[in-house]
């Protein structure tokens, strides 16, 4: 079987897709004669498995040197009233025996050159070491968020209170221009009494103990101060920082994305975009889990209507529990019922609203698209950067508030919306109108667009023969061969 690189994805289709993209990059660069890729993934109650089998069949067919190993089903044992993050982290730990068995079996017929894990799969780090396999992390957000995570054990020492109670208190991270509010920390660390808090501290403390960290970004995109803070050891003041390899941007090809959305509606929105003037359309899409209460949808609609701008807006079904934005949108809802009366009719000449899903990568590359309202999920950020489209930053969950800070203040490729933290991040219609006009009409918006266009060219160059990301991938492979 030769040399193999084993990747271990955290639960869920999004994490598997990220690992597949890394595997594809390695195979594309070095060919299947050099490395084959095996991706380990979990099966159980916390995993959304509906879209996974079809996706894996597609990848296995188109990339035969990438194979998949699904673990036996694990039933989560936790019944206590704890957070979803804590339940997921416990679920991953329960898969440790399967990780050990998989590495044991693979090692019998192949030389495992590297074991690459997701941050949430940190409990597998000592297993890789146990087999004397060089073990790396694949970090799927940007360098600024990585700097924060590396530094987080030091932040933990600065207070004994929960960040959710500190709210407006700000914390400084090495290399960042602006501090982060306590309430904008990643959700699993907001409550010090949640088991997920100690899990996250453990994950962050183990990052430096790996053989290296592979990051889905490219050097030219990142603030030099952040890159210097990581390389100079400021983020891990108590010990050595492992090598960091910036190998992105890794973006999934649209043809391999899920085609669950209505094909006719998808074609309609692309045809509509082709008829609009250059850089005139604002695209609004908040990721696979970005669902808003009806009251917020009405404010967005009012802001868009008042702005007078052309728009393509992806609307997901409002969540049943309004406090939760992490609910998958589906098509079984009345679009007119969640928007202001007459909105669709009044804006029909300059706007289009689609339910649940649009082919984001294709949309962002359309000549008519001039701006993107995003939840700041890192994949979406990279897709916008590659397409050269400036952003309005509207973070919802995960590390997105961290990304917002850096996109607006350090990278200067986005305008931030003002969110009312005391109202769950609510944004008024007036604020929507203000930021939309700022991006689409002002000199500042034009400057952002120019900057994004240049970064798009740099993204392409980074993956070229002499680019920074190619050099970093060569350095990674040199470290394992």
UniProtKB/Swiss-Prot annotation:
Chain residues that bind UDP-alpha-D-glucose: 288, 357-358, 375-383, 397-400
EC number: 2.4.1.-
Xref: PROSITE patterns: UDPGT
Keywords per UniProt: Glycosyltransferase, Transferase
Highest taxon listed in the record's lineage: Eukaryota
Record keyword Transferase present: yes
GO molecular function: UDP-glucosyltransferase activity
Transmembrane segments: none
Enzyme class: transferase
InterPro entries the record matches: UDP-glycosyltransf_plant, UDP_glucos_trans, UDP_glycos_trans_CS
Function description: Glycosyltransferase that may possess chalcone and dihydrochalcone 2'-O-glucosyltransferase activity.
Entry's family note: Belongs to the UDP-glycosyltransferase family.
PANTHER family xrefs: GLYCOSYLTRANSFERASE
The name this protein goes by in its record: UDP-glycosyltransferase 88F5
């Amino acid at each position: 079987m030769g040399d193999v690189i084993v990747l271990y994805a955290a639960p869920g289709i999004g994490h598997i897709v990220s690992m597949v993209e890394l595997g594809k990059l390695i195979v594309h660069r070095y060919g299947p004669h050099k490395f084959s890729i095996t991706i380990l993934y979990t099966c159980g109650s916390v995993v959304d498995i509906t879209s996974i089998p079809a996706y894996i069949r597609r990848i296995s067919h188109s990339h035969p040197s990438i194979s998949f190993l699904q673990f036996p089903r694990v039933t989560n044992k936790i019944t206590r009233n704890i957070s979803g993050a804590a339940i997921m982290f416990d679920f991953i730990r329960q898969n440790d025996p399967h990780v050990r068995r998989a590495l044991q079996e693979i090692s019998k017929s192949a030389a495992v050159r590297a074991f690459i894990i997701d941050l949430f799969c940190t409990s597998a780090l000592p297993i890789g070491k146990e087999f004397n396999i060089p073990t790396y992390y694949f970090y799927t957000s940007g360098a600024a968020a990585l700097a924060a995570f590396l530094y987080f054990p030091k932040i933990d020492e600065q207070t004994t209170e929960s960040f959710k109670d500190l709210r407006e208190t700000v914390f400084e991270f090495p290399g960042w221009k602006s501090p982060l509010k306590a309430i904008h920390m990643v959700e699993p660390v907001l409550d010090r009494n949640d088991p997920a808090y100690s899990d996250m501290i453990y994950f962050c403390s183990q990052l430096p103990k790996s053989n290296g960290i592979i990051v889905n970004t490219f050097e030219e995109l990142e603030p030099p101060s952040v890159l210097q803070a990581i390389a100079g050891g400021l983020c891990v003041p108590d010990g050595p920082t492992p090598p960091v390899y910036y190998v992105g941007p890794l973006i999934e090809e649209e043809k391999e994305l899920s085609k669950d959305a209505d094909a006719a509606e998808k074609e309609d929105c692309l045809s509509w975009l082709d008829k609009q003037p250059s850089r005139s359309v604002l695209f609004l899409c908040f990721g696979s889990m970005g669902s808003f209460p009806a009251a917020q949808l009405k404010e967005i609609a009012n802001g868009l209507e008042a702005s007078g701008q052309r728009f393509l807006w992806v609307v997901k079904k409002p969540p049943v529990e309004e406090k939760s934005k992490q609910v998958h949108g589906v098509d079984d809802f009345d679009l007119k019922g969640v928007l202001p009366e007459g909105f669709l009719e009044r804006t029909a000449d300059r706007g289009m609203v689609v339910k649940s899903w649009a082919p984001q990568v294709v949309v962002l590359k359309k000549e008519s698209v001039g701006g993107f309202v995003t939840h700041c999920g890192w994949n979406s950020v990279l897709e916008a950067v590659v397409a050269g489209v400036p952003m309005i930053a509207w973070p919802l969950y995960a590390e997105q508030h961290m990304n917002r800070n850096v996109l607006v203040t350090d990278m200067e490729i986005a305008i931030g919306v003002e969110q009312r933290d005391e109202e769950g991040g609510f944004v008024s219609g007036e604020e929507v109108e203000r930021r939309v006009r700022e991006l689409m009409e002002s000199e500042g918006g034009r400057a952002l667009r120019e900057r994004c266009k240049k970064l798009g060219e740099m993204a392409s160059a980074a993956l070229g023969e002499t680019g920074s990301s190619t050099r970093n991938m060569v350095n990674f492979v040199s470290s394992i061969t």
